[in-house]
């Protein structure tokens, strides 16, 4: 003799408990303050920053970013981590052509600007490598920010001269330039 018994229960429970994933925005973005990312307690708001500095925007409706600009330099949206109340982003490593000292922030629901100054560093020359080079050989200028100012390459906008003669730039990085 064989007996079969089937039973079923529905044990699906939905819990909401007012959960907020911090991604919902309800209007145009508002920036209340900007902080250095190292200031985890958000104690000292900043009004200026340096190239490549990580900053945190504090405000509301900051999720769903479409565009961020410092002066006229656009930051790729993929570099922004944003929730409704904060956005973490780097200041782009590029010198602006037009300086208006504004941070422009655009989302799906609107845009805003915030007064923010980006400090642009000057070219810094610290010294030479191979300072006793023979005529016709290359030397390296050591320093910082050579790549920001248009030295070398097909689209160069800056030149290096020695005794009035323009030198050809062989290679360049942010910390050295070979001429």
Model-predicted regions and their roles:
Residues 91-97:
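Short, surface-exposed loop/turn segments at beta-strand-coil junctions that are enriched for proline
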Residues 47-49, 68, 81, 95, ...:
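Hydrophobic beta-strand core residues of beta-sandwich domains
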Residues 97-109:
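Short, aromatic- and glycine-rich surface loops/edge beta-strands on solvent-exposed regions
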Residues 74-80, 116, 166-171:
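Short, surface-exposed loop motifs enriched in S/T, G, D/E and P with embedded aromatic residues
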Residues 4-8:
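C-terminal motif of bacterial Sec signal peptides marking the signal peptidase cleavage site
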Residues 80-90, 171-178:
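Aromatic sugar-binding surface patches on proteins
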Residues 10-63, 109-155:
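Beta-strand/beta-sandwich contexts
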């Amino acid at each position: 003799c064989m007996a079969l018994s089937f039973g079923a229960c529905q044990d699906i429970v939905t819990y909401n408990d007012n959960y907020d994933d911090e991604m919902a925005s309800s209007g145009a973005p508002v920036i209340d303050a900007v902080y250095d990312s190292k200031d985890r307690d958000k104690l000292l708001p900043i009004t200026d920053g340096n190239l490549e500095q990580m900053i945190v925007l504090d405000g509301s409706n900051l999720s769903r970013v479409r565009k961020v600009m410092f002066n006229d330099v656009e930051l790729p949206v993929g570099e922004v981590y944003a929730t409704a109340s904060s956005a973490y982003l780097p200041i782009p490593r590029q010198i602006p052509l037009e300086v208006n000292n504004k941070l422009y922030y655009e989302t799906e629901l609107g845009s805003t600007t915030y007064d923010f100054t980006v400090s642009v560093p000057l070219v810094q020359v610290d010294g030479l490598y191979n300072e006793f080079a023979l005529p016709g050989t290359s030397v390296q200028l050591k320093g910082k920010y050579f790549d920001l100012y248009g030295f070398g390459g097909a689209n160069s906008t800056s030149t290096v001269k020695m005794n009035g003669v323009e030198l050809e730039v062989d290679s360049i990085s942010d910390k050295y330039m070979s001429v």
